[in-house]
A protein has these predicted regions:
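Active-site phosphate-binding strand-loop segment of PLP-dependent enzymes
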Residues: 1-84, 89-90, 265
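PLP-dependent aminotransferase class I/II
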Residues: 7-9, 80-296
């Protein structure tokens, strides 16, 4: 009775119709916030992504090569202009440099990449820290917040983020993510020890731009550690916020442990997908061999 708003996410970039949820909220006078953090493009059933909610939120940096930027939108209500502070000139320049550094790291700027690599290597020497384990285990809240600068919430996005959002084409992003998802699906349709989190069929992503391919693994820990050690584009939600309540029927803890998320990013090509998928299959096969006794 005290509920004023409900937040409903489209997980993994695989948007679903929110028709029943929308009706449930309307019947009770509850505002629906459509969480599109994983899902920037496509259809969610009868409506476009972001059009079910009274408000919708999205994360641009998950789909575009941006240093930052989130989105608040509404297909039904007016949104007052936010009075955001302009970032400092230093922050603006750093944002531009960060974009160039990331592009150089992923084989962009072919002609001048050696020069850029040397420059960024020198730049980063001062900020290098001792390595940490690739597998994160139950950090305290203060540690988890180190990568989250909440002092920025009153500041406008950087020039670099807004310029790239406006200039970059959408078609290639959508198509390559669909291709990558479909490629993963060919590997994991019938595998011992793992299965797609959701049923996959020919039209699963025909109207979507997938964020990841969610793969349920029965015994994930050793496999995940090996994949992370190989620096493959795979992750899972293994950071659960301290004091998160344990709610009946909540599948979040199970997913955070068992669901490996195989990235479908548009800059991953078929060879990248094949390499990652085959590594997963090899680890699964090795695991199964160790678990099952040999016949004599």
């Amino acid at each position: 009775q005290k509920c004023k708003a409900m937040l409903v996410p489209h997980y993994f970039g695989l948007a679903k119709s929110l028709k029943e949820v929308r009706q449930w909220c309307d019947d009770r006078g509850i505002a629906l916030i459509e969480d599109c953090a994983h899902c920037y493009f496509g259809q969610a059933g009868e409506r476009a992504v972001g059009e079910w909610g009274d408000f919708s939120t999205a994360s641009l940096s998950k789909f575009f090569p941006l240093p930052e930027a989130g989105l608040l939108a509404s297909a039904h209500r007016s949104i007052k202009s936010l009075r955001l502070e302009k970032p400092s000139l230093k922050a603006q320049l750093k944002g531009c440099v960060d974009v160039i550094e990331l592009a150089s790291r992923y084989q962009r700027f072919t002609g001048i990449r050696p020069f850029l690599a040397s420059f960024f290597k020198l730049k980063n020497i001062r900020s290098q820290q001792p390595g940490v384990s690739e597998v994160v285990t139950n950090r305290e809240a203060s540690e988890m917040m180190r990568d989250c600068d909440m002092a920025r919430i009153d500041q406008a996005p950087l020039w670099a983020a807004m310029a790239l959002k406006t200039a970059l084409p959408r078609g290639r992003i959508i198509l390559q993510r669909q291709i990558n998802f479909a490629r993963y699906a060919t590997y994991f349709s019938d595998v011992l020890g793992a299965k797609p989190l959701f049923p996959i069929h020919e039209n699963s992503v025909a109207s979507a731009a997938p964020y990841v391919y969610p793969l349920w693994v029965d015994n994930p820990d050793s496999i995940y550690q090996a994949l992370r050690a190989m620096k493959l584009p795979v992750f899972r939600w293994d950071r659960i916020w301290p004091k998160t309540p344990d709610l009946p029927g909540d599948i979040g803890p199970l997913w955070s442990h068992h669901v490996l998320q195989l990235l479908c990013h548009q800059d991953l090509n078929t060879a990248d997908i094949d390499h990652t998928a085959r590594a997963v299959l090899h680890l699964l096969k090795t695991q199964q061999a160790h678990r099952q006794p040999f016949s004599t």
